[in-house]
Regions:
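Conserved SAM-binding loop of SAM-dependent methyltransferases across substrates and taxa
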Residues: 66-79
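Residue-level signal for inorganic ion chemistry
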Residues: 20, 73, 155
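Conserved beta-strand/loop positions that form the S-adenosyl-L-methionine
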Residues: 62-64
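S-adenosylmethionine
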Residues: 80-83, 87-168
Length: 168
């Protein structure tokens, strides 16, 4: 198991996975079928971001969906403030239900879309996973990144990343 996943944090991650799978049975918020898939393809995918988060960061997670990486970051970095941006009502319901069940006082769920003229705050970190192209994310959030802030984007295959970076 990863060093970040131990003790109380491991219990919270386990509870989160179980809640996500149960909710997913009726509401189809992601494509994983079992706990092992969620752990191996979602939770472990988010862990490299955790190491890049400093203490007391203000983080915006775009298109939070099933809580990856936003809820995972909130559990593993409880001293950081996490804003989960999601446009889907059912996904916001799930995120709020999960936040309350896990007593994540560092999480706010924002039910909204984002555009270039948004009035969101400034963040030290902006994350996204399967939200949009790198170029589109940069265009939509350029006014929301603090000076010396950074993007932590989970984008998948190297070929796709190279293609998106070339398009910028």
């Amino acid at each position: 198991m990863h060093k970040e996943l131990s003790g109380k944090k491991e219990e919270l991650i386990d509870y989160f996975i179980n809640e996500a799978l149960t909710f997913n049975l009726k509401h189809n918020i992601f494509i994983r079928a079992n706990k092992e898939e969620v752990l191996n393809k979602d939770i472990l995918d988010c862990l490299p971001l955790v190491e890049k988060i400093k203490t007391k960061e203000k983080i915006l997670d775009l298109g939070s969906g099933g809580g990856f990486p936003g809820i995972v970051l909130a559990i593993l970095r409880p001293d950081s403030e996490i804003h989960l941006l999601e446009k889907s009502q059912k996904k916001c319901y799930f995120l709020n239900k999960t936040k309350d069940a896990l007593k994540l006082k560092n999480v706010s769920v924002l039910k909204t879309t984002i555009n270039q003229k948004n009035t969101l705050e400034k963040y030290s970190v902006i994350t996204a996973r399967a939200f949009s192209s790198i170029k589109n994310i940069l265009d939509l959030t350029k006014n929301n990144l603090k000076e010396n802030g950074r993007y932590l984007l989970l984008k998948g295959r190297a070929e796709k990343i190279e293609e998106e970076i070339t398009a910028i």
